[in-house]
Amino acid sequence: MMLSSTSLYAAIDLGSNSFHMLVVREVAGSIQTLARIKRKVRLAAGLDTQNHLSQEAMERGWQCLKLFSERLQDIPLDQIRVVATATLRLASNAEEFLQTATEILGCPIQVISGEEEARLIYHGVAHTTGGPEQRLVVDIGGGSTELVTGNGAQANILVSLPMGCVTWLERYFSDRNLAKDNFDRSESAAREMLKPVAQRFREHGWQICVGASGTVQALQEIMVAQGMDELITLAKLQQLKQRAIQCGKLEELEIPGLTLERALVFPSGLSILIAIFQELAIESMTLAGGALREGLVYGMLHLPVEQDIRSRTVRNIQRRYLLDTEQAKRVSKLADNFLLQVEKEWRLDSRCRELLQNACLIHEIGLSIDFKRAPQHAAYLIRNLDLPGFTPAQKLLLAALLQNQSDTLDLSLLNQQNALPVDMAQHLCRLLRLAIIFSSRRRDDTLPAVRLRANGETLYVLLPHGWLQQHPYRAEALEQESHWQSYVQWPLLLEEFN
């Protein structure tokens, strides 16, 4: 069956560092990514002191757009949005570039204001990023930095500042020297630019801070490569700065997890981010699921911003893989009941509760491939599917839980994830496995009144007197489960009460 072009949408962002194109297909009220194309054009590097854009920089941009234009030919014009940001807002000869660019693409290009850019970034984050409703969004681009606070779908404070990782690179690291002096000057200039707006942001407050740029993506990749958790903090940023200073020169910058492509603008982006953390008194930051391009696409689709993006993602997976939602709810409800019984002893919090519920709601996804090795298939799918609202670390945890939902346990998977402390992840795994065993008859009226009691790592499963004898299938499964858990030093004791 041919893919209907009417369901295709494209968003192009002519940024100061890179040009990006996102092509998506609308599927049942959400988007499926078909193509993401990114080319480092470094347009901002072509600006001289008079803000005149060099011929070479324009040529780099046009070459990239020729590549994009072929992909756009199958998409209806009213389903394409092309925007230009900081450098083309600033360039005195922007019109010359835009005229040729419009001819190449065959569709209009809109040079958007910094405030409109901030609004679109926030819109993209609101559609793709989970967590609390009240958020601060930070996007460090090539030529500008956007700061936005908002609640749910509504942006409140929108600020765009003329500092970016390309302009700061040319201004403070032009000698390609990673000396402390260069970092100090770069940070100091960024802090001066932030001072007029910082207090307003601090007074407004937020529950979660989200980063939506290549700099933040690079930091995330570095942290994952080094086995850290995914929360970005000022201490980690300072640590990375020291590491960069030790490297001495930009061409010698080597940090595990930092790609060659991102290395050039990494020190300048890092110094801007450090200044933002200091001036706005940010405690921690996570990576956004989307930003400007997603904001453009969702704007064309007119889809409402859901209160809980993770729930929407889980529902879409259940629909797409034809999961038995009744059974998923049954397992989820039982696992939740188990968690509430042991949460004090095991110090399980609301994060644990939500992640356990999500694991339960999609635990049978592996069956859509085959019953044999279903847990492994489930883990593979969860690791590789696009899951809006879930961070990379949360995806790894869900995959680890699903791979360990039955049979022998592989603790290395739970130890390698960093969404939760290892002991919490292990405790969730134990509860998930028990909920699946007790729900195996797939009927509500067969669930016993199970009581759980935890004492350190020992877990007591208390059942009504005679239940084990009357239910030999599940009794055997529980006996086997007790052995499997004991192999990894998780004592599981079955007892009956009158």
From Swiss-Prot:
Keyword presence, Translocase: no
EC number(s) stated in the UniProt entry for this protein: 3.6.1.40
SUPFAM superfamilies the record matches: Actin-like ATPase domain (SSF53067), HD-domain/PDEase-like (SSF109604)
Lineage: superkingdom: Bacteria
HAMAP family per the UniProt record, alphabetical: GppA
Family per record: Belongs to the GppA/Ppx family. GppA subfamily.
Cross-referenced PANTHER family: EXOPOLYPHOSPHATASE, RETROGRADE REGULATION PROTEIN 2
GO biological process: guanosine pentaphosphate catabolic process; guanosine tetraphosphate biosynthetic process; nucleobase-containing small molecule interconversion
Keyword field: Hydrolase
Function per UniProt: Catalyzes the conversion of pppGpp to ppGpp. Guanosine pentaphosphate (pppGpp) is a cytoplasmic signaling molecule which together with ppGpp controls the 'stringent response', an adaptive process that allows bacteria to respond to amino acid starvation, resulting in the coordinated regulation of numerous cellular activities.
Protein name: Guanosine-5'-triphosphate,3'-diphosphate pyrophosphatase
Lineage of the organism: Bacteria, Pseudomonadati, Pseudomonadota, Gammaproteobacteria, Enterobacterales
A matching Pfam family: Ppx-GppA_III
Transmembrane segments: none
Catalytic activity: guanosine 3'-diphosphate 5'-triphosphate + H2O = guanosine 3',5'-bis(diphosphate) + phosphate + H(+)
Keyword Hydrolase recorded: yes
Entries under InterPro entries matching the protein: ATPase_NBD (IPR043129), Exopolyphosphatase (IPR022371), GppA/Ppx_hydrolase (IPR050273), Guo-5TP_3DP_PyrP (IPR023709), Ppx_GppA_C (IPR048950), Ppx_GppA_N (IPR003695), PyroPPase_GppA_Ppx (IPR030673)
Pathway: Purine metabolism; ppGpp biosynthesis; ppGpp from GTP: step 2/2
GO molecular function, one term: guanosine-5'-triphosphate,3'-diphosphate diphosphatase activity
